[in-house]
């Protein structure tokens, strides 16, 4: 592929349920990352980008506040969910409420778009 892109993808709330959102549901106040169900339709879209030759890096903020190393769990989930990727980065990601950047996509907008042209 001549126009290979490096694409960073978040995990929670992007390719699987968000643990913090799950905790808002009655009876799920103690939900953990293990309880998050994958969004297979979204995973397939990113897998297609990988198959097209793009480099896919999954980067998660899991453990940023708690200091817990979620690398093993997260890699196991990616394997079980058949997520194709070049690299996994766990931690080291800043926590923020909003990210403004000329190269970012909102997950909902990206996955629900009729056309997904890459820049």
What are the roles of these predicted feature ranges?
Residues 1-119:
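Catalytic phosphate/metal-binding cores of nucleic-acid and nucleotide-processing enzymes, i.e., regions
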């Amino acid at each position: 592929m001549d126009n290979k892109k490096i694409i960073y993808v978040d995990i929670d709330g992007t390719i699987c349920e968000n643990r913090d959102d799950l905790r808002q549901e009655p009876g799920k106040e103690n939900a953990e990352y293990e309880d998050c169900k994958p969004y297979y339709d979204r995973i397939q879209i990113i897998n297609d980008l990988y198959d097209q030759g793009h480099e896919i890096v999954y980067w998660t903020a899991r453990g940023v506040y708690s200091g817990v190393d979620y690398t093993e769990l997260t890699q196991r989930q990616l394997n079980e969910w058949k997520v194709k990727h070049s690299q996994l980065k766990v931690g080291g990601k800043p926590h923020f409420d909003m990210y403004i950047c000329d190269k970012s996509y909102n997950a909902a907008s990206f996955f629900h778009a009729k056309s997904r042209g890459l820049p």
